[in-house]
């Protein structure tokens, strides 16, 4: 069960930074490391956590400068730095390998992790992903409304977000942490050299759909899943579908 933001207080020091983290589940299960979307903290995984714990031991963490994690005065807010931070956190927690999965903004960190630390991966998950700077967002609200309407028509409801999922300790640091995509190049083509299995998934009503399909097509070991009635931020639109895709991927790979 996910602790509230107020009660979640585990801290690990890695790369000289104090990181807020949570490690849940049975030690015998394969590790799934989840990388947050933009503007949220690790408690926002609550809608899918219980379902995912049936298959995985789950590591969550707040990237530097967000949630309850500290940051470096040198302002090292880059996806490569976030990836190195995750690798260091795994080392301190004695987690040699993980299935690293990022959603939306977090998928950029997951992609960099794969490029820099493939030896620490059992698999890679890229949900709602685009790796181009910047992302075209003009249609995001229209597409989101379409997804909500479709869900309403079939009697499904989106998750009602908790305010605490967006809590963070320092507004200026969080802003810097969540604008790294404006400064980094597209790494899509580099993913084609990966040897590990890669799961790419995106909603039909997500502005990143075409980018996600392009990324999946560029990866020899890539598998693409299309999520119907789903906008950007798929765990909040259809958490059960999101969890089933991730859990089924484990079964297919026999992780």
Language-model segments: residues:
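Hydrophobic, aromatic-rich cap/lid helix
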Residues: 161-190
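Flexible "cap/lid" loop of the alpha/beta hydrolase fold
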Residues: 108-116, 121-152
């Amino acid at each position: 069960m996910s602790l509230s933001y107020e009660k979640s207080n585990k801290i690990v020091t890695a790369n000289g930074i104090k990181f807020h983290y949570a490690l849940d589940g049975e030690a015998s299960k394969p590790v799934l490391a989840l990388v947050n979307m933009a503007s949220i903290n690790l408690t926002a995984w609550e809608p899918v956590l219980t379902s995912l714990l049936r298959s995985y031991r789950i590591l969550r963490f707040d990237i530097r400068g967000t949630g309850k994690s500290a940051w470096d005065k040198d302002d090292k807010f880059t996806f490569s730095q976030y990836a190195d931070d995750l690798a260091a956190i795994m080392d301190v927690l004695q987690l040699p390998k993980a299935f690293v999965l990022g959603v939306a903004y977090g998928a950029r960190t997951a992609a960099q992790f794969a490029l820099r630390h493939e030896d620490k991966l059992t698999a890679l998950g890229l949900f709602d992903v685009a790796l181009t700077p910047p992302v075209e967002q003009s249609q995001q609200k229209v597409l989101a409304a379409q997804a909500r309407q479709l869900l309403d028509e079939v009697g499904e409801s989106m998750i009602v977000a908790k305010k605490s999922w967006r809590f963070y300790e320092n507004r200026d640091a969080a802003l810097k942490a969540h604008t790294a995509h404006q400064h980094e190049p597209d790494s899509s083509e580099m993913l084609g050299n990966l040897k590990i299995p890669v799961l790419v998934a995106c909603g039909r009503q997500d502005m990143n759909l075409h980018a996600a399909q392009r990324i999946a097509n560029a990866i020899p070991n890539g598998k693409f899943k299309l999520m119907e009635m789903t906008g950007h931020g798929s765990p909040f639109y259809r958490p059960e579908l999101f969890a089933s895709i991730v859990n089924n991927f484990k079964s297919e790979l026999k992780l």
